[in-house]
Amino acid sequence: RAQAWSHGAMNRLDQLATLLRFPSISAQKEHARDVSDCADWLVDKLSGMGFEAVAHKTHRHPVVVGRSPREEGRPTVLIYGHYDVQPVDPVELWESDPFEPEVRDGKIYARGATDNKGQLLAHILGVEELQRQNGGHLPVNVIFLLEGEEEVGSGSLSLFLKEHRDELACDVIVVSDTGMAAPDTPTFSYGLRGLAGAEIIVKGPSADLHSGVFG
């Protein structure tokens, strides 16, 4: 049993290494094909788990949607994540190739290892393990929503959600893009800071006014 566990762990690490090797930099046009190839890998992975998986084209980078076989009467959990990564410049400051994973001091170093490919794959592999333990079934219906533009502002996501609202209907959303309080402390993050903008318009006189008279 220990040998089987060890083999399974190595297989999962190999899958993570494969995912990390895609230079899926959404901000750079020259990596558009790499982003698309990464999306295709995720589709293949989810399809191999029995999910109905599609890489939907957008005006920029694909949105991957994977759905488990639906079982009536069970709630639906949507797991959101992103497979795009930040640029690597200045590359000369890296101790190793950012797209060739390297283990140092028990840690995996590669672009995207903790934002967000590690978390994303952890959820996928967790669902796969649940399937294995339950004869291919899941206690809930699962939808994976994996985008390729999070690092550039998710420009295609809003329209995609509007166009696929019914298809993505769910009871609970889990965001697969957070960290842990400590390496040995599993963590549920239930809130993050968002973005807010404001435009302030100030109107006043066209000439200086005496504060003692007009103030």
Where are these regions (language model features)?
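Acidic/histidine-rich catalytic neighborhood of metal-dependent amide-processing enzymes
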Residues: N116-G191
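Short small-residue beta-strand/loop micro-motif enriched in glycine and branched aliphatics
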Residues: I108-A110, S206-G212
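Flexible glycine/proline-rich, aromatic-decorated loop/lid segments
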Residues: T187-K203
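N-terminal helical capping/dimerization or prosegment-like subdomains
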Residues: A2-V91
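Acidic-enriched catalytic cores of C-N bond-cleaving enzymes acting on peptides and small amides
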Residues: A181, Y190, G197, S211-G215
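Active-site metal-coordination/substrate-binding segment of hydrolases
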Residues: R74-L146
